[in-house]
Amino acid sequence: MSADDLILHYFEDIKEGQSASLAKTISESDIYLFAGLSMDTNPAHVNEDYAQTTVFKTRIAHGMLSAGFISAVLGTRLPGPGAIYVNQSLKFKAPVRIGDTVTATVTVTGLVPEKKFVTFRTTCTVAGKVVIEGEATVMVPARG
């Protein structure tokens, strides 16, 4: 992603119902990189032999790896650069596996003009199935 890919929406430009998305296919490298950065080396993510003994029968991606794509949408698409996270709730509904394409979507559900806060419904899906759902509140830059 380059600076040319960034989209900035000022608070005054945002409307209820507005949405934005991005998608990423999860690779084995993504899981190992996230494990290293987050220090979450749970064998359910990084050890296939162990993962085969779990309910999932194979390694799964870290839930927060997929949830991070919500942050990417908020920081680069809607509202975009300058957006500051205030709150995020998440419910993890299904696992994400290597090779799955995760689509993160944010949809504006409310505006608080006096604080320049925007609330969003947040979801991550794989093949149309919701794997993460939640709500975010973001402080958004205003014009001038």
Curated annotation (Swiss-Prot):
InterPro entries: HotDog_dom_sf (IPR029069), MaoC-like_dom (IPR002539), UPF0336/Enoyl-CoA_hydratase (IPR050965). It comes from Rhodospirillum rubrum (strain ATCC 11170 / ATH 1.1.1 / DSM 467 / LMG 4362 / NCIMB 8255 / S1). Pfam families: MaoC_dehydratas. CDD domains: R_hydratase. It comes from the Bacteria. Keywords: Fatty acid metabolism, Lipid metabolism, Lyase. This is (R)-specific enoyl-CoA hydratase. Homotetramer. The lineage of its organism: Bacteria, Pseudomonadati, Pseudomonadota, Alphaproteobacteria, Rhodospirillales. One of its GO terms (biological process) is protein homotetramerization. It catalyses: a (3R)-3-hydroxyacyl-CoA = a (2E)-enoyl-CoA + H2O. GO terms for molecular function: (3R)-hydroxyacyl-[acyl-carrier-protein] dehydratase activity; hydro-lyase activity. Catalyzes the hydration of trans-2-enoyl-CoAs with a chain-length of 4-6 carbon atoms, forming the corresponding (3R)-3-hydroxyacyl-CoAs, which can then be utilized for the production of polyhydroxyalkanoates (PHA) polymers. Cannot use trans-2,3-octenoyl-CoA as substrate. It is an enzyme of class 4 (lyase). Residues 13-128 form the MaoC-like domain. The gene is phaJ. Its EC number is 4.2.1.119. The keyword Lyase applies.
